[in-house]
Structures are given as structure tokens and as C-alpha cells.
A protein has these predicted regions:
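Acidic, metal/ion-coordinating pockets
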Residues: 1-176
């Protein structure tokens, strides 16, 4: 299919903790990766919007008979998505991540509330930063997670109009 053809041509890593092959019950891509910078280990967790099933071409997610072959942990409450993200963050932490940076394609404006980036943060713990996309907005905000801890949430708009930089100060734990 087209997505896998593009992925095969790319040199980039593709991450998504919630893009599932419904036939195999496996994720299509690695859910996260851990990179080491000096003595600091940072996990990058990929999160895909469940709206991919309706806001892109739905035929790409079905077989020839029209049966869904992919899913994004979509449900009416958002709990499936929150559970998968939490499971992935916990696994990354258990595997030695000092910090967790979620790379999301979730958005806020025009997105179902249960799948918004700020809602995912509010229903999980352990994410330090969420760098967002999908809704093509520019924002930098702090959102309280499920434990009441502030998480940096940022999105830089569209078409490289702006760019962002996240700085983690490992000696103080400050993130900006």
C-alpha cells in the first residue's frame, strides 16, 4: 500500500504507539525509540490521531472487501488511546528513559475532544513534552497531566512557517 511504499523509501524513523494492524494485533511501526544524549536518555513516543480513519482517505485503511485492516485505538471515550499511550510511556520509562517526548499528530482545533493533544495529556502521566501537529496551529502551553504535573505542549503551525525548539535541562529538570 502507498504508506508502506513511502516508508520504505524514507530514511526517517516512523513511530506510532497506536497505529495497529487489526489482522495481526501488532503496531505497524515502533511505538517509541530511546536516544542517548550524554548521560540522559530521551524516549520519543509516536501518537497518531484516530481521525486518520475519517479525515484522510478511509479506503486506505480497508481491504478489497471493505473490512477495516488498520485501527488507531479509537473508541467513543478516548480511553483506548489513553491506555495505549500510557502503556507505551510506562514501557519507555521501564527501559531507562529519563524523559519522554511525545511526538503527536493529534491537534486541538477542529479535533474531537477525546483525541485532542491536551486531552491525551490530561488522561496520562509520564510525558514531559508533547510536540504536536495535525491541526496546523501555533501554540505553546502547559497542560496538567492526570497527576496534576504540567506538561509542555507545542505545535508550530504549517508548511515550515515557524519552527520550535525544546530544551531539557537535565541538572534542574526544567523543560522549555
Amino acid at each position: 500500500d502507498q504508506l508502506h511504499e513511502l516508508v520504505d523509501r524514507s530514511n526517517a524513523a516512523y513511530l506510532s504507539c497506536n497505529f495497529d494492524n487489526l489482522g495481526t494485533a501488532a503496531t505497524e511501526f515502533s511505538p517509541y525509540t530511546i536516544e542517548t544524549y550524554g548521560n540522559v536518555r530521551v524516549a520519543y513516543v509516536g501518537i497518531s490521531t484516530p481521525e486518520s480513519l475519517t479525515k484522510s482517505n478511509p479506503a486506505h485503511f480497508k481491504d478489497a472487501s471493505g473490512t477495516d485492516i488498520y485501527g488507531f485505538c479509537e473508541d467513543e471515550t478516548g480511553q483506548m488511546l489513553y491506555d495505549r499511550v500510557q502503556q507505551t510511556v510506562d514501557e519507555a520509562r521501564a527501559n531507562g528513559a529519563d524523559y519522554v517526548v511525545a511526538i503527536g499528530h493529534l491537534g486541538q482545533s477542529g479535533v474531537a475532544t477525546r483525541w485532542r493533544s491536551d486531552t491525551v495529556i490530561a488522561n496520562t502521566t509520564g510525558i514531559d513534552v508533547l510536540i504536536d501537529g495535525h491541526s496546523h496551529e501555533q501554540y505553546e502551553q502547559r497542560v496538567a497531566n492526570k497527576a496534576g504535573r504540567d506538561v509542555l505542549l507545542a505545535q508550530t503551525g504549517t508548511q515550515l512557517q515557524t519552527y520550535g525548539e525544546v530544551i531539557i535541562h537535565p541538572t534542574t529538570g526544567k523543560i522549555e
